[in-house]
């Protein structure tokens, strides 16, 4: 009697391939498009309320524009104080100015100023800085002597504006000493003049001879 083998159990992969997929649900119904002529509605299908206290919403928009325009450069949103909107958030802060002017009396003289400058009195009329006037002569120094050499005393000379009296204070200059070589110098100059005269006469004769030869050549026919 032959042995009958039992059939193998069904494979799970074969069962999944043989199964049919479940049917898909039907698509949802399409909602109709809202009418554009009706009132404006938001996402919750509620009418958009108008601004309170306005009939058509224009005054409220103007108030918003005014509130936006009131914001200055330093109060603009997204900017830190001290930063300008044109430079962006990463721009460095502006360089601080020199600050208020300091009074030299309060803080003393600066490093470049002489401490004695603050003790000098103000300059009078006709005075120049560094040159005191007639009444402000430094102590311990005599007054400067005038250039005429008479200690400030001007005499009445013969000419207008002359200084120093009649002009007899200064002796006349002494005469020059006699030249011992005057005779030899005159003799040398005389010999040179004679030599130049002879050379000049010789040059004139040469020119006259050349001119005569030239005229004779022109007069003879060729």
Curated annotation (Swiss-Prot):
Family: Belongs to the papillomaviridae E4 protein family.
PTM section of the record: Phosphorylated by host ERK. The phosphorylation triggers a structural change that enhances keratin binding and protein stability.
Main function: Contributes to multiple aspects of the viral life cycle including viral genome amplification, suppression of suprabasal cell differentiation and egress of newly formed virions. Induces host cell cycle arrest at the G2 phase by associating with and preventing the nuclear entry of host CDK1/cyclin B1 complexes. Inhibits cellular DNA replication by preventing loading of host replication licensing proteins MCM2 and MCM7 onto chromatin. Within the cytoplasm, associates with host kinase SRPK1, a splicing factor regulator, and inhibits its activity.
Chain residue ranges for the region called Disordered: 1-184
UniProt keywords, alphabetically: Early protein, Host cytoplasm, Host G2/M cell cycle arrest by virus, Host nucleus, Host-virus interaction, Modulation of host cell cycle by virus, Phosphoprotein
Miscellaneous remark of the record: The major E4 form is first synthesized as an E1^E4 fusion protein from spliced E1^E4 transcripts, such that the first few amino acids of the E4 protein are derived from the N terminus of E1.
Gene Ontology cellular-component terms listed: host cell cytoplasm; host cell nucleus
Main location per the UniProt record: host cell
Quaternary data: Assembles into oligomeric complexes. Interacts with host CDK1. Interacts with host SRPK1; this interaction may favor expression of late viral transcripts. Interacts with host cytokeratin components KRT8 and KRT18.
Subcellular location: Host cytoplasm; Host nucleus
Residue ranges with Pro residues bias: 20-32, 90-101, 170-179
Protein name, per record: Protein E4
Amino acid composition bias (Low complexity), ranges on this chain: 76-89
Gene Ontology annotations of biological process type: symbiont-mediated arrest of host cell cycle during G2/M transition
Record field: compositional bias (Basic and acidic residues): 1-16, 48-73
Domain of life of the source: Viruses
């Amino acid at each position: 009697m032959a042995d009958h083998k039992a059939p193998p159990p069904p494979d799970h992969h074969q069962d999944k391939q043989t199964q049919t997929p479940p049917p898909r649900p039907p698509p949802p119904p399409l909602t109709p498009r809202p009418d554009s002529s009706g009132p404006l509605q938001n996402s919750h299908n509620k009418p958009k309320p108008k601004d309170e206290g306005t009939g058509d919403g224009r005054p409220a928009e103007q108030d918003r524009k005014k509130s936006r325009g009131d914001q200055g450069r330093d109060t603009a949103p997204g900017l830190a104080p001290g930063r300008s909107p044109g430079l962006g958030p990463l721009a460095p802060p502006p360089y601080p100015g020199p600050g208020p002017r300091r009074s030299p009396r309060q803080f003393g003289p600066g490093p470049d100023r002489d401490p004695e400058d603050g003790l000098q009195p103000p300059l009078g009329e006709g005075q120049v800085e560094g040159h005191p006037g007639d009444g402000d002569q430094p102590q311990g120094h005599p007054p400067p002597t005038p250039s005429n050499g008479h200690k400030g005393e001007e005499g009445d000379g013969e000419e207008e504006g002359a200084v120093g009296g009649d002009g007899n204070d200064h002796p006349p200059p002494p005469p020059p000493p006699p030249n011992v070589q005057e005779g030899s110098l005159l003799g040398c100059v005389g010999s040179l003049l004679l030599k130049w005269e002879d050379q000049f006469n010789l040059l004139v004769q040469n020119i006259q001879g050349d001119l005569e030869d030239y005229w004779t050549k022109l007069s003879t026919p060729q």
